């Protein structure tokens, strides 16, 4: 379960939402993955702003450059951090943060084909196809597929 949220957590950033991408990504994926996976994706949004020296997670330098050293998170982010840090799936969300830093390193090359088996075994693809099912997230996948659709 741990690898899947790491692989999928930025789906909404790639798609269309940068702000609150963890919340959007979790909602997009929730109907198709185990609850722990969507929870981890949602909560990494908050955890990424808070160091955890016990697992070797420091506040990312790229965040300090982007947001500034004195950046204060929004109250909802602080609240979700407090919820997540004592949750049984804390490390699933924290592992996203620990492994996310590789995406900021231009020297790290990752080939998605290496992970197709993991995704295929754990992602519950609807028979009708993403966006064609009746899940609460179907409209997001339709928008992703056709962002310029007039109606």
Question: Model segments located where?
Answer:
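Post-HEXXH active-site segment of zinc metalloproteases
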Residues: 15-31
């Amino acid at each position: 379960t741990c690898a899947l949220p790491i692989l999928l957590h930025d789906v909404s950033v790639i798609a269309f939402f940068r702000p609150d991408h963890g919340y959007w990504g979790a909602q997009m994926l929730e109907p198709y993955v185990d609850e722990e996976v969507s929870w981890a994706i949602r909560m990494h949004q908050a955890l990424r702003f808070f160091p955890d020296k016990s697992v070797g997670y420091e506040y990312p330098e790229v965040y300090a450059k982007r947001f500034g050293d004195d950046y204060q998170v929004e109250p909802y982010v602080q609240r979700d951090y407090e919820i997540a840090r004592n949750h049984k799936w804390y490390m699933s969300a924290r592992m996203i943060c620990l492994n996310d830093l590789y995406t900021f390193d231009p020297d790290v090359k990752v080939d998605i084909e290496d992970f197709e088996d993991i995704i295929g075994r754990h992602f519950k693809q609807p028979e009708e196809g993403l966006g064609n099912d009746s899940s609460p997230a179907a409209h997001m996948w339709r928008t992703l597929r056709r962002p310029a659709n007039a109606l």
